[in-house]
Amino acid sequence: SSILYYMIGQRFRQENFGSKLWQCIEEPNSQALSFIIKEFLKQAIGAWEQRITFQSITVTRVDAKIHIEVTYVVNGTNSSQYLDITYDRSDNSLNTQ
């Protein structure tokens, strides 16, 4: 999940590491934003985490919070895993579980 905390270009010697999620900070909380977040997650995690295969990404918006649920399968073990991400626009915090 550290991929999500870095902006692309922020990490020394791994200029392409990170995600574009931080580009969404000023965007209105709309259905279009949900789509953009899904695409940014697929790009970032897909590029850097070859050990998994996505099953689903769900984005829900409630007031200033954006809740993201990522379900994936760990390749080789076929075990299903879950990543829970909450982005709170009111204080610009990103939390993962």
Model regions and ranges:
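Immediate N-terminus of the mature polypeptide
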Residues: S1-E39, Q43, Q55-Q97
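Short secondary-structure junctions
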Residues: G46-T53
